[in-house]
Structures are given as C-alpha cells and as structure tokens.
Curated annotation (Swiss-Prot):
Subcellular location field: Cell membrane
Name of protein: Uncharacterized protein RBE_1264
Feature: compositional bias, Low complexity: 654-673
Organism: Rickettsia bellii (strain RML369-C)
Keywords assigned: Cell membrane, Membrane, Signal, Transmembrane, Transmembrane helix
Signal peptide as annotated in the record: 1-24
GO annotation, cellular component aspect: plasma membrane
Topology term for the membrane: Multi-pass membrane protein
Region called Disordered, residue ranges: 624-673
Length: 673
C-alpha cells in the first residue's frame, strides 16, 4: 500500500513538473520584439517585467498568422493551480493589468504601480501586437505576424493639403530634413488653396467639398467681373476716339492696345495652364510667369550665396541627384545639414558604429583632393558614455554635459548660448522665407484687382503699392540669406578652421542621402587638429572621456584640453554675440533695402529666446538679492528708477491735464486766429 502511494505521488509530481515546464516560457512571443540600444526598457522598467509575465507559446496559444486577434497567457501568482490564464483580444481591444490578473497577483494585478497600466492590441509595422505605454512611447510586449500586412496609408487626394506634406522628405538628401519639407508642403498647399483647388471627383461635390474650393471659385468670378470691366474700358475708349480726334492718334491707339493686352494677360489670362496637380485651370500671366519668378528669386540668389560660403565641401550637395523640379531642396538641405553637423549627428559625420550606413549602397561622392582621413575614429574608449552609441542622437549636448560633470560650467554655458543663437537665427530665416512666400501668393491671388488699376491715373498708386510689396517679399529672403551665409562662413572658420570634408552618397530604394566626413588637409593638418570642431568630433566618437567615482556613483566627464576648448568656444561665442545684436536690425535693413514692409511682427524673432533667458536671469538675480535683504539691481526699485518713472508719468499727467493752459493749447488757439 505504501509503495502504491509512493508511485502515485511520483506520477503526480512528474505531471505537475511537465505542466510547469510547458508554461515555463514566460516572455515568449510569436514574433520578435523590438529592442532598445541601451536595454533600459527591457531590464530596468515595468515594460520588461510585463514581457516576462506573458507567454504566447503556452498550450492553447495561437501563433497562426491567418487567425484574427492575439492570444496570450498572463501569469498567475505563485502557487496557483494554473501557472497562467489564457486571453484572446481582437484589434482595438484594451485591458488593464488588474483586469487580466483575476487572482489578484500581488506582483501584477494587485501591484499599485502596475495595476492601472492599459494594454492595447494594435498593428505594429507588419505584426499585430499587445502595446504598453512607456517613457519612449507605446512599445509591444507580445506580437504575432500578420498574413496580410496593412497597406501603407494612402495620401488623401480630396484635400487642400499638398502631397509633399506626406512625401516631401523623399526629395531631400540630408539625413536631418525639415526646412525643405516645410517649404514644399506650404507651396503645394497654397497652390491648392488659392489656384488649383482640390482634386475631388465631380461625384463628390458635397457642401463640404465646395467649401474647399472657395478661393479658386471666387477668383473665377472675380476674373469674369474684371473681364466685364475691361470690355467697358474698351467701349469708353472707343466712344472717346469717336468724339475726340485726339484719341484717334496712332500712338495713343498703339499704347492703348499694348496696355490692354498686358493687363488682360496678367489679370484674367488668355489660356489654360496645367499646374502642379495636373488639373487644367484658366491661368493668367501672373501664375505662368509672375509667381514662379517671384518665388524663385529668393532660393536662386540664396543658393548662389551659400555655394560661395562655408567650409570646403561641408554640406554641399550634388544638385544633379535631386529629382526634376526639386533642386531648390539643396539650399534647405545645406541648412538642415549644418544644424545636424554643428550639434553632432553621428551619421552626418559618416560615423557608423551601429552598421546603419552599411545597409545602403554607397555611390560616388566628392573628390578627396588629397585630404587625409582621421585615424582610429571608430574605436571609442572604454569610459565613453552609452549615450554616444545611440543612432541619430545629437551628441553636442552629451559632450556639453560631460564638461559640466567635470566642473567646466563656463564651457557648458558658452556651448548652450552658441546653440540657442544659431538655431534662433536659422529659424528666423526659415519663418521669414515662409511668410514672404505666403505674402507673394496672396499678392498673386489679388492681382486681378490691382493690375487693371494701372490703366487709370487715379488708381495707379494702388498698383504701384501692390508691385512694391510683391518685389520686396521676393527680394527680402535673399538679403537675409546673405546674412545667414556670412554667419555660416564665420562659424565654419571659427569651428573647423582649415579642415576639409569628403561627401559620401548613399542610396537604397530611391532614398538618397549624403554624409560628410571630416578630414585633415594635406598641408597644415595641425591647424585642423587644434580646431574646436576636430576635438568635438573626437569626443563624439568616444575619445577623451574619463570616469570618476563621486559618492559611490560613477560619472563620466571630459577633463582634457579644457583650456583650448574654452578658448576656441569663446571665439565662437564672440561671433554669436555679434550676430545676435546684428540680427536685431536685419529685418529693418532688408525692408529698407527693398523698399518694402518689415516682417518682424509675423516672423520668429532671432533674439526672442536669448531675451527671455536674459530676463529670467535678471529675475533670478533680483530674487536672490531680495532674499538676502539687498535692494534689487534693476530699475524697478521703489526709491530709484520706479520713482523716477512715477515722477515722469506724473509730469506727463500734469501736462495733459493742464488743458487750455498748456503751451500746445495756446499754440493751437493762436493758430486758429
């Protein structure tokens, strides 16, 4: 009897052990899950813990790509009869951890930190996944492949939004690109709004669709009205010619015909023209010649200036590799490229530690012209921080933090001031160009009203004002571009000195981009090696870092070449301060030079961020002095500047309230006599 019981116990233990081993694969997913480069989410957060509490390959699981939904087994608390509970959720379903953990597992459903986390079933690339919110966005904790991956979202055609707003990045050759995308997106959108209209079919002409074509429809009616007015103008001229022989003069008739043809062609048009959306519309001379000319002047002039500026080979793209009609992207790519280059985007430097560039086919690039590559650039020191291994990170701020951890606060402040001023000025140029382009489109849209005004002496002033604003908005971005080109030239000279750059062109699946490798010149290479940009590149590559133990915690910092780095950075900072003050008047200078309106009120101020920082610093300083019982240093002291302003205001009020006793009133009354 005892032997029989022992055998039963052994059989039960074996069966339970087999069951446990069948459920022992927690963390198994039907499809592979994405991993982060530093492994932070998988090892140090609730995300990794939830992954290790889900099993998709347990008995009863479903990894069949043809079956809908996602089936998984959610872990129960230790000692339960079943290691986990099976669930099946369809796409779009959501469940809280507390709802999935029905046995109040103290490690999951009863955990106050985890119980309110919501898991949602959604498509993730080509898989259907159970997604969990994390600090880095929604991330999948379990996935299953789909037999029919979802088709990419189609670009809406029945819309006023330009197609380049969705696909514009494909025309760029810069790894970091947003300027060209913004310009082309706005241009195509303005084309649709003002002139072309949407591409909706006639069967969809509902009230909502009609509202989308309000501007082109109104201009069509406007052209009809202008055409009728021109007919009346011809009739009145004919009456005058019959009644007055002076109007029958051949010179006046010839001048009348020339002016009439000019006004007719540039206001209401003489024939159709296919615009960008391949939809034929009745175009006028302003759309065929005026608008392309006005919007093309600025990028053409700016591109000429930019090609003559900057370091040798840095961010100079091959315009022949752009698609037809998108060569203007070269200007904006050079701006975006410099933002990434100055701020340490590793791939732009042709640093490929993670093998990203190796997956692309490398074509012919620039000419090395005898320049020398930097030796051992791809071998980082063991003390370099993990943040330098992230693909696409802006390593400038990581390096600045390394200087800060070494106690070099001046370098940190100087670097941040340089970055803020540089980005602010470039943002000002981009917004200035966009505002001028919008103004040109508006001026073109109302051109049927103002162009006929040149026919009459009393209204010719309105035409002159319209023409002045149009030409000014076409030329102002070119003036500002000259200022930006000067800024970039000074920065390149101060940061990289005589360093040279070799372009590498990459291509894969119609995606083209270029990188620029910093190289030593064949002569005077030591000048380049002492430059701020060369030393920063070594820090980006993981060289020169040190590790120290501070209060039992290891920190990584930069303590080498501090004096030379500070000297070079202060030189860059001097140029930044000069351009900061010069940028305050660049808008007024451009407006005066082109005899047009000033755009400050509708563009991003190039000094706004720095001014806010200065005001914040002054406020903190005054607050610190107030806590120490000292009077504030600003002009708002009750007994100093504030009282002076009060006295001045009081004097002004007295002058105003003096009424007829004031000298101004006496002068007015005497003038009346």
């Amino acid at each position: 009897m005892k032997i029989h019981n022992i055998i039963k116990i052994i059989i039960v233990v074996c069966l339970e052990g087999f069951a446990l081993t069948s459920f022992a694969g927690f963390g198994d997913s039907c499809a592979s899950l994405p991993t982060t480069t530093d492994g932070y989410l998988e090892s140090d957060t609730a995300y990794g813990y939830i992954i290790r509490s889900i099993d998709m390959k347990a008995p009863g699981g479903n990894c069949d790509a043809n079956k809908p939904g996602i089936t998984f087994c959610f872990k129960n608390k230790d000692g339960s009869s079943d290691p986990c509970t099976m669930y099946t959720l369809n796409q779009g379903d959501s469940k809280k951890i507390s709802d999935l953990s029905k046995d109040n597992n103290p490690d999951l459903g009863a955990n106050p930190i985890l119980k309110n986390i919501v898991l949602t079933v959604q498509t993730w690339q080509n898989d259907i996944c159970l997604l969990m919110p994390t600090s880095r966005g929604p991330m999948p904790v379990a996935c299953k492949a789909l037999s029919n991956p979802p088709a990419p979202p189609s670009v809406p055609s029945c819309s006023n939004i330009g197609q380049s707003c969705y696909t514009g990045a494909n025309y760029s050759q810069s790894l970091i690109n947003f300027s060209g995308l913004a310009v082309q997106c706005l241009k195509e959108t303005l084309d649709k709004i003002f002139f072309v209209g949407n591409s909706c079919g006639s069967q969809s002409q509902s009230s909502e669709i009609t509202n989308l074509t309000a501007f082109p429809t109104f201009q069509g009616y406007l052209k009809n009205a202008i055409g009728a007015a021109l007919i009346l103008y011809v009739m009145f001229f004919a009456f005058n010619m019959v009644l007055n022989k002076e109007y029958g003069n051949p010179d006046k008739i010839a001048l009348f015909v020339i002016k009439l043809l000019f006004v007719t062609y540039f206001s209401i048009g003489l024939g159709p023209l296919n615009f960008n959306s391949s939809q034929p519309t009745q175009e006028n001379g302003m759309l065929k010649y005026g608008l392309p000319l006005l919007t093309g002047i600025a990028p053409e002039f700016a591109q000429i200036i930019f090609n003559a500026a900057g370091s040798k080979g840095l961010c100079v793209f091959d315009t022949s590799k752009y698609q037809s009609g998108y060569q203007f992207y070269a200007l904006w790519d050079s701006i975006d490229c410099r933002i990434g280059y100055y701020l340490g985007l590793d791939l732009l430097y042709n640093i490929d530690k993670n093998g990203v560039l190796s997956s692309f086919a490398r074509g012919d690039g620039g000419n090395s012209s005898g320049s020398i590559p930097i030796p051992n650039l791809g071998n980082p020191d063991k003390n370099s921080p993990n943040a330098l291994t992230s693909v696409g990170s802006l390593r400038f701020f990581t390096v600045m933090f390394g200087f800060f951890m070494a106690g070099n606060v001046i370098i940190l402040i100087s670097g941040l001031v340089f970055a803020v001023i540089f980005l602010s000025i470039l943002l000002y140029f981009i917004t200035h160009y966009l505002v001028c382009m919008i103004t040109i489109y508006v001026m073109t849209y109302v051109s049927p009203i103002f162009i006929p005004m040149m026919l009459f002496n009393r209204t010719k002033g309105y035409f002159d004002g319209w023409l002045k604003v149009s030409l000014s908005c076409a030329l102002q971005p070119a003036v500002v571009a000259g200022f930006i080109a000067l800024l970039i030239t000074m920065y390149d000279s101060a940061i990289f000195k005589n360093c040279e750059f070799l372009r590498y062109d990459y291509e894969k699946n119609n995606v083209k981009f270029s990188t620029f490798e910093l190289r030593l010149p064949a002569s005077s290479a030591e000048v380049c090696q002492e430059s701020f940009g060369y030393k920063m590149l070594n820090y980006y590559a993981g060289k020169g870092w040190e590790e120290h133990l501070v209060i039992l915690f290891p920190i990584k910092s930069i303590a080498k070449d501090v004096v030379s780095i500070l000297a070079e950075l202060l030189c860059v900072l001097v140029f930044s301060v000069i351009f900061y003050y010069f940028s305050k008047s660049i808008s007024q200078f451009a407006a005066d030079l082109t005899n047009g309106p000033k755009m400050d009120a509708v563009t991003a101020s190039p000094t706004k961020i720095v001014d806010l920082v200065k005001q914040g610093a002054a406020f903190i300083k005054d607050a610190a002095q107030a806590t120490q019982g000292k009077p504030p240093s600003s002009g708002d002291m009750p007994g100093d500047g504030g009282s002076k302003r009060s006295e001045g205001q009081k004097g002004d009020d007295s002058f105003i309230s003096s009424g007829g006793n004031s000298s101004g009133d006496s002068l007015s009354s005497s003038g009346g006599k």
